[in-house]
């Protein structure tokens, strides 16, 4: 039996199909209890077809142990009549006819490291945002030139000099707030860096990727998290296409597209490959990636296009290393040992107890005590916070419940 599931945030619609006709349809809530009710109604071993979405990913993990789960890409064409039941019926029938592309369902391990890598990237962007705010604050007060002799104002010497700068009171308050925010993000970045190093230390594929010039611990884990099982890519060209480092085609009849756009692919994988290319370019020794980049650049190609071309070559090397389960043949032994040593030292760090799961409830209680209750109510609310303290207690109870 095949079962089509149209998954939504609050409710899922299910259509059961026996190969000839629809035998039944029912709805269930998108909760654990609702999924258990689904399992009671649908026989074990059935094929569950789910449309790719955030809710669909959660359902696929919960149903994968009991059913054969097919996660499919959403249909590209529009329909004149659209209901949840029709959508569920359409995806189950089109999947049976192989009209829809099936999506890769990563294992729980791959999902976990994907989450850690995404968090690290987000924290890095927040750090860059706060640093830009500090630079803008200094430029507004026309004192940026006083720090020209320092290459990085967020280094040890730069922060010492920054602490002696005199600014107007409101700007000093803003600077203190930015630095406090920066300190928090840097601490989180360090903790995630430790988690990534521990993942790398226990993953053979990641350590093989680190033998490639330009790929460090983070980029290796990022590449591994997005590729998952390399066996799902039949050739290196398939991996390059998945990463989006190949030209996009838009040909029709006698018309041949001559644009320079790159195919849309996995954003995180493309980001990791371009980071690896930049690392290989900045390395002291000449690698095949560095020589290839120089060759492309000498033809008058812009640096961005040359990096994408080198990223395609990097993707081919990654596919070869992961497929053969052998280290990169042109690896720099000294640099590889150095990267492994740095990885081991990071993995040995002790994560502060303040970020342990056991501390979550304590952190929530402390956060509730610091909440500005006035901001929780609209300015035209009937509640008067200053006179009715029971509102604050009720809000605490709601959050802690």
Question: Regions from the language model: what does each represent?
Answer:
Residues 37-78:
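Conserved DEDDh/DEDDy metal-dependent 3′-5′ exonuclease domain
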Residues 21-45:
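Nucleic-acid-processing active sites and adjacent nucleic-acid-binding tracks
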Residues 70-102, 115, 255-264:
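Short alpha-helix plus adjacent loop in nuclease-associated cores
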Residues 254, 293-401:
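Low-complexity, acidic/Ser/Thr- and charged residue-rich accessory regions of DNA metabolism proteins
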Residues 79, 208-211, 217, 221-299, ...:
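Phosphate-backbone recognition surface of nucleic-acid-processing proteins
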Residues 92-115, 156-167:
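A short, charged helix-loop
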Residues 121-206, 335:
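Glycine-rich, often acidic, oxyanion-interacting loops/wings at catalytic, nucleic-acid
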Residues 1-17, 91:
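Gly/Thr-rich phosphate-binding beta-strand-loop-beta motif of the actin/hexokinase/Hsp70
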């Amino acid at each position: 039996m095949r079962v089509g599931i149209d998954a939504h945030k609050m409710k899922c619609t299910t259509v059961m199909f026996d190969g000839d006709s629809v035998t039944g349809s029912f709805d269930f809530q998108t909760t654990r209890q609702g999924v258990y009710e689904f399992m009671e109604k649908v026989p074990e071993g059935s094929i569950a077809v789910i449309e790719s979405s955030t809710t669909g990913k959660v359902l696929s993990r919960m149903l994968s142990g009991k059913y054969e789960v097919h996660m499919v890409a959403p249909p590209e064409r529009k329909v004149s009549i659209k209901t949840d039941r029709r959508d569920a019926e359409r995806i189950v029938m089109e999947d049976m006819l192989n009209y829809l592309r099936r999506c890769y369902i990563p294992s729980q391990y791959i999902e976990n490291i994907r989450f850690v890598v995404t968090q690290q990237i987000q924290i890095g962007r927040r750090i860059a945002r706060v640093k830009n705010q500090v630079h803008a604050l200094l430029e507004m007060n026309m004192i940026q030139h006083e720090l020209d002799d320092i290459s990085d104002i967020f280094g040890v010497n730069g922060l010492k000099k920054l602490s002696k700068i005199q600014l107007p009171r409101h700007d000093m308050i803003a600077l203190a707030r930015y630095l406090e925010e920066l300190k928090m993000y840097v601490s989180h970045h360090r903790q995630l860096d430790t988690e990534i190093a521990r993942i790398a230390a226990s993953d053979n594929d990641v350590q093989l990727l680190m033998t490639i010039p330009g790929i460090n611990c983070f980029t290796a884990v990022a590449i591994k998290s997005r590729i998952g099982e390399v066996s799902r890519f039949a050739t290196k060209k398939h991996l390059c296409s998945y990463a989006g480092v190949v030209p996009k085609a838009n040909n029709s009849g006698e018309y041949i597209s001559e644009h320079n756009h790159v195919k849309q692919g996995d954003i995180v994988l493309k980001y990791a490959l371009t980071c690896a290319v930049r690392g290989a370019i900045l390395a002291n020794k000449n690698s095949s990636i560095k020589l290839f980049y120089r060759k492309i650049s000498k033809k008058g190609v812009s640096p961005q296009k040359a990096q994408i071309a080198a990223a395609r070559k990097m993707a081919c090397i990654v596919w070869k290393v992961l497929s053969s389960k052998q280290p990169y043949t042109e690896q720099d032994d000294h640099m590889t040992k150095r990267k492994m040593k740095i990885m081991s030292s990071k993995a040995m760090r002790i994560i502060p107890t303040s970020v342990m799961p056991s501390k979550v409830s304590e952190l929530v209680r402390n956060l509730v005590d610091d909440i500005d209750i006035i901001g929780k109510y609209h300015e035209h609310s009937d509640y008067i916070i200053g006179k009715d303290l029971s509102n604050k207690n009720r809000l605490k109870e709601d959050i802690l419940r």
